Amino acid sequence: MARRLQVSFYERGHQTGVYLFPDDQPAPPSYQHSPIVAEYFAHCEEERRRRSGARARLIGSPGEIFPNTALHPRQPRTIAAWHPRGTHQTEVWRWYLVDKAAPSEVKDFLRGYYIRYSGPAGMTEQDDMENWNYAHAASRGTIARRYAYSYEQGMGFEIEDYESDGLRIPGTVMDITEAKSSEHNLRNLYRRWTEFMEAGSWEALATWRRNAKAMAAE
C-alpha cells in the first residue's frame, strides 16, 4: 500500500505532498482509450523509473513554492502563480505543461484533458474555487471573527529524517496515510509568512546562510 506524506521545508517555507509506493508495485495502466497515448505514457513511466532510481517510489502531489507559486507534478501538469489583488481578491496565472517531443495525438489529448479538468471552465477548478469563495465569505462573518481559528490538526506527529526501506526523504514529514488529512503544510506556510512579516532584514530571513557560515567556521 502506498503511504501518503506531507513534506515541509521549514527554512524556506516550501511544502508538497508525495505518495510513497512499495518498491515492487507496478504502475497501473492509464489512458487506455488510445494505443498511441497509452504507449507514450507507459514509455514516460519507464524513463522516470530508470532515471530516478530508488526515488522512483515517490509520486508527486500538489505542492507550493513560497510564497505564491503552486505546482502539480502529475496530470494535469501545471504551474500556478497566485497574485493578491486586494484584500478579497486573488488573480491566478496558470501554465499547462506538455512535452515538446510528444506525438501530436498526445498533445491533442492533453489539450482537451486540461480544459475539461482544470482552468476556469474545468471540473475541479470550479469546484475548488467555490469552496474557497464560500470559506472566505464565511471567515468575514461575525462569529468567525469572534473566535481564533485552530490550525492544530496533526501537531506532534511530525517526523524528521523520515526513512522507508533505505529511502530517506528530506524535510519534515507528516504521514497522513491513516489520518487522511493534516494542517502540517499549511502551518509551514503561515510560519514562514509570519517570519517575513516580523523580520527586520533579509539576513534574518536567510537562516540557511547563517547555518552555512557556522558550518564553515567549524
Q: What is each stretch, according to the model?
A:
Residues 1-218:
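C-terminal catalytic domain of Rieske-type non-heme iron oxygenases
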